[in-house]
Amino acid sequence: MADLRAGLLGIGQMGRHHARVLREVDGIELVGIADPGGDAHGVGGPLSILPDVEALIGLGLDIAIVAVPTRFHEDAALKLAAAGVHTLVEKPIAHSVESGARMVDAFGGAGLVGAVGHIERFNPALQELRRRIEAGDIGAVYQIATRRQGPFPARIADVGVAKDLASHDVDLTAWVAQSPYSTVFGQIALKSGRPHEDMVIASGRLENGVIVNHVVNWLSPMKERVAIVTGELGTFVADTSTGDLTFYANGTFPLEWESVTAFRGVSEGDVTRYAFPKREPLRVELEAFRDAVLGLPSDVVTMEQGLKTLAVVEGVTESARTGESVSF
């Protein structure tokens, strides 16, 4: 079978990595790159940088990656769908739920694969976490808490931290727990003088009863990417910046210290850091997209799933505006 002919729209901070990995994945040939801003990162190689999505479509593509600012996702995606091109757009799916819904309809109606680049699902720590939860290693899951903090990224100008970063945590939480959100409550802050929120606190509950909490901001001088799952038998801590997964087991030995034994809760047990293969998440994601296009079993994030994530994120900001929780 001939390689899938791939086009890449946008070679900024994320698109440049797509350019590298698309050239490495078996079964894909990168035949065209488009970016109206040119090749700032020097990733074009032998390919001339085209001006727009129409020029890309003219190359006769099988698949496309859209890595442009969020406000341009819908226009590019609808043109690609009309041309019969299977497409993966970077997260979030779109700048609004209404826009994302039009994209879902376009790709579904055309019988095409429409996917969203929620790359955290392909992080080795989170994949191992989900596998161990499924295996019952933690027993019943009680709570999932995430922290995603760091300095402001110069690449983001058209959305706030909720859609840019909290979308990661909303998606990975529902995916790890295998349950959608039922309610969310949010608080936001604007501290940097920009038009969009740069700090978010969100809490909520999933349909399966798990309670969740997310701390997200662009105003921390240190970078933190952590997901903590507390359950019946202990706590998992996944560090997605390093790909590490650690399990803190509940203690099984009787306690003798009187002030501790008086507390009717859990005690500290063994701590285990797991060893497992750590493949590059973007490569695994693009392989999943390729497989979906070929009709093979795939864990690619569909546009329908991406739209649900965006709806929850918009629920967080709506809750912050009204002071009321939002239900789904």
PLM regions: where:
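A contiguous active-site-proximal alpha/beta segment in oxidoreductase catalytic domains
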Residues: 94-156
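Beta-loop-alpha module in the N-terminal Rossmann-like domain of NAD(P)-dependent dehydrogenases
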Residues: 18, 47-106
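C-terminal glycine/acidic-rich active-site capping loop/insertion
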Residues: 119, 233-304, 328
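Hydrophobic residues in well-ordered beta-strands that form the structural core
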Residues: 89-90, 114-116, 238
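C-terminal helix-rich "cap/oligomerization" subdomain common to oxidoreductases
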Residues: 1, 23, 63-65, 288-328
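Rossmann-like dinucleotide-binding domain that binds NAD(P)(H)
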Residues: 153-222, 228, 304
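N-terminal Rossmann-like dinucleotide-binding module
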Residues: 1-44, 173
